[in-house]
Regions:
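Glycine-rich helix-loop-beta junction characteristic of Rossmann-like nucleotide cofactor-binding loops
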Residues: 63-67, 91, 143
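Nucleotide 5′-phosphate-binding alpha/beta core
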Residues: 1-33, 39-56, 60-64, 69-70
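AMP-binding/adenylate-forming
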Residues: 47-61, 72-131
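Conserved S/T- and glycine-rich ATP-binding loop of Class I adenylate-forming
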Residues: 34-37, 73, 122, 151, ...
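Residue-level signal for alpha-helix termini/capping positions
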Residues: 63-67, 115, 137
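Gly/Ser/Thr-rich phosphate-binding loop
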Residues: 143-183
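Distinct, well-ordered alpha-helical segments
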Residues: 132-138
Length: 183
């Protein structure tokens, strides 16, 4: 395996913006980018086939977590250049469940939507899940009032202790959703 070539994030940065793109520009239908906080942003172009595979992989992950066509799922990642929001969004749709693209911000409204629309699952960062729990409590509501049962958390590191706290405070089962732009 040591003889197999591989591409590093630095390789992508050194060839910014499109130097290592594996498809011709005419086949690229969407572009995402990293934040660029530690160097040049990593620019990633996606073909229709890439997006189809991505959606299918996300649907499989969600299915493994117990999400079904009968679920309503809030995607509370940011939408835009960051890949998380759209990846989770299209995965939920591919599965046949209902997606609510709540994105980020206005947490009290988000909690009311979770309660009123009977949202059963959420995809967001673990830190936002903890903030949801804090806001829920400040609103005088309980985990029973909102009825979440599944959480797909990612886009930042989190610990097993954070998982336990999120599960306890929101009354759901939390799963780590893995992702990266570069593949």
């Amino acid at each position: 395996i040591v003889k197999l070539p591989f591409t590093t994030k630095q390789d992508l940065r050194d060839n910014y913006p499109y130097g290592l793109q594996a498809a011709p520009p005419s086949e690229i239908v969407r572009v995402h980018a990293s934040s660029g906080t530690t160097g040049n942003p990593t620019i990633v172009g996606y073909t229709r086939k890439d997006l189809s595979v991505w959606s299918e992989v996300m649907a499989r992950c969600l299915t493994a977590y117990g999400v079904t066509r009968d679920d309503t799922f809030s995607v509370a990642y940011g939408y835009g250049l960051f890949t998380g929001g759209l990846g989770a969004h299209y995965g939920v749709e591919n599965l046949g469940a209902t997606v609510i693209p709540t994105s980020t911000g206005n947490t009290e409204k988000h909690i009311r939507l979770i309660r009123d629309l009977k949202i059963s699952g959420i995809a967001c960062t673990p830190s936002y899940a903890l903030y949801l729990a804090e806001t829920l409590e400040k609103m005088g509501l309980t985990k029973e009032d909102i009825g979440l049962r599944i959480g797909a958390f990612g886009a930042e590191p989190w610990t097993e202790n954070m998982r336990k706290e999120i599960e306890e405070r929101l009354g759901l089962k939390g799963y780590n959703i893995y992702g990266l732009s570069e593949i």
